[in-house]
Amino acid sequence: MKLQLIAVGTRMPDWVTRGFEEYQRRFPRDMALELIEIPAGKRGKNADIVRILQKEGEQMLAAIPKGNHIVTLDLPGKNWTTPELATAMNKWQLDGRDVSLLVGGPEGLAPACKEAAHQSWCLSALTLPHPLVRIVVAESLYRAWSVNNNHPYHRE
């Protein structure tokens, strides 16, 4: 199974890139984690946020291979514990489809992305900076993988 993290924003600080890559490289080849960056629309004083969100959403959806299971990261989503995420990941594997996880920009996800989603995951009730979300998602997915594979990384 392939995991895709599709996130709005490019040119992240080095610490974000290093943090994400640290967890990305830990995954085995049969569970690859890929990052796809979508350029953020220009936001200024007179920016048309609705149009920006729509365009970002179109680009995100275009990046998803046909047949992928789509999971949005969104506040109204389900709060998963590590064991619940591990169970979800196991179901995704048994389903035989690759998974695309969508992270929006400062205003969140486009309505079209939310409508296309098969599941929605609330990473935290806290407001997290979008660059940090990439690392937290990568670590959480790796931890869930480690639970499913009896790897010593996760301890209860």
UniProtKB/Swiss-Prot annotation:
Its EC number is 2.1.1.177. Its main location: cytoplasm. It comes from the Bacteria. Keywords: Cytoplasm, Methyltransferase, rRNA processing, S-adenosyl-L-methionine, Transferase. It is found in: Cytoplasm. S-adenosyl-L-methionine binds at L73, G104, L123, S124, A125, L126, T127, L128. It is an enzyme of class 2 (transferase). InterPro entries: Alpha/beta_knot_MTases, RlmH-like, tRNA_m1G_MTases_N. Signal peptide: none annotated. One of its GO terms (cellular component) is cytoplasm. Belongs to the RNA methyltransferase RlmH family. NCBIfam families: PRK00103.1-1 (NF000984), PRK00103.1-4 (NF000986), tRNA_RlmH_YbeA (TIGR00246). Homodimer. This is Ribosomal RNA large subunit methyltransferase H. It comes from Shewanella sp. (strain MR-7). The lineage of its organism: Bacteria, Pseudomonadati, Pseudomonadota, Gammaproteobacteria, Alteromonadales. The gene is rlmH.
